[in-house]
Amino acid sequence: MPVQGSQRRLLGSLNSTPTATPHLGLAANQTGARCLEVSIPDGLFLSLGLVSLVENVLVVTAIAKNRNLHSPMYCFICCLALSDLLVSGSNMLETAVILLLEAGALAARAAVVQQLDNVIDVITCSSMLSSLCFLGAIAVDRYISIFYALRYHSIVTLPRARRAVAAIWVASVLFSMLFIAYYDHAAVLLCLVVFFLAMLVLMAVLYVHMLARACQHAQGIARLHKRQRPAHQSFGLKGAATLTILLGIFFLCWGPFFLHLTLIVLCPQHPTCSCIFKNFNLFLTLIICNAIIDPLIYAFRSQELRRTLKEVLLCSW
C-alpha cells in the first residue's frame, strides 16, 4: 500500500497496475502494445468485501453459538470462514486507507504507512494461505468420513482438529512473513504456486474418489431394489456436476492470482505478461468472490447451521 505510484492493492510490490479510472478497455503496456485491462471500481471492491465480511461473520457466530456444531468438521468450516473474513477485511482496510490517503483525509508519515502496509499484507497473505489449507482440510475430513466411516470419530477427534487448526494458522503466519520479506525471490513465488497446485490436486483426487464411491453405492442400492440404470446415471451426472462446480469455482477464483505470480517469475518484462499484470485487482476481486461463495458451498447447506443462523438474526432484531 505505497503512498505514491502505481501500486494499489494487496502485496503492492507485486502489482504493476497503474491507478486508473474504472473501465474495461484497451490499455498500452510498456512496449506500446494494446491489451485488455479490467479495472475494478473501488465501490464495487468494497461492496463485495462487505458482503463477504458479513456473510462469514454470521457463519462464525452461528457455529460459536450452537454447541451441536462444535465438531471437527464445523471447526474447519468455522476456520475457513474466519480466514475468508480476514481476507475480505484486510483488503477492505487497505483500500479504505488508500482512498483516504489519496483524498488527503488521512495524513501519515511514509514510515507509518509502510509499517501498516506490511501488517496488512501479512494478515492478507496468511489468511489466503490458511483459507487454502482449510479447504484442503475439509476435503480430507469428508474423505475420512466416507472411506473410514466406522473409525471416523476415533481418527478425527476434536483435540486433533484443534491441533491441526493451530498448526495451519502458525504455518500460514510464518510463511506469509517470509513471503512478504522475500517477495522478490523467484523461489518464494514458485513455492506459493506449487502450494496452490498441490491443494488443487489434493482436492480433485479426494473429491473424484468420493464421487466414484458414491456412484458405486448408488449402483448397489439400485441393484438391491432392482431399479433401472437411468436412475444411477442421473445420480452420477448430478455428482459430476456438483464436483465440477466445486473445483471449477476454486480454480476460477484462485487460479488467476497464482498465474500472476507464475508469470512474474517466468516473463516479468514480456508484453503479454505485462498485460496480465494490469489485471491484478481483478484477480484479488475473484478471491473476494470466492470468500462470498465458500459459505454457500460449505456452511449454509447445513440445516442445523441455517436454523442457528435464523435464531441469531431474530435475536439481533
Curated annotation (Swiss-Prot):
Keywords: Cell membrane, G-protein coupled receptor, Glycoprotein, Lipoprotein, Membrane, Palmitate, Receptor, Transducer, Transmembrane, Transmembrane helix. It is a multi-pass membrane protein. Residues 1-37, 94-118, 184-191, 267-279 are extracellular. SMART domains: 7TM_GPCR_Srsx. The chain crosses the membrane at residues 38-63, 73-93, 119-140, 164-183, 192-211, 241-266, 280-300. Pfam families: 7tm_1. Interacts with MGRN1, but does not undergo MGRN1-mediated ubiquitination; this interaction competes with GNAS-binding and thus inhibits agonist-induced cAMP production. Interacts with OPN3; the interaction results in a decrease in MC1R-mediated cAMP signaling and ultimately a decrease in melanin production in melanocytes. Belongs to the G-protein coupled receptor 1 family. This is Melanocyte-stimulating hormone receptor. It comes from Erythrocebus patas (Red guenon).
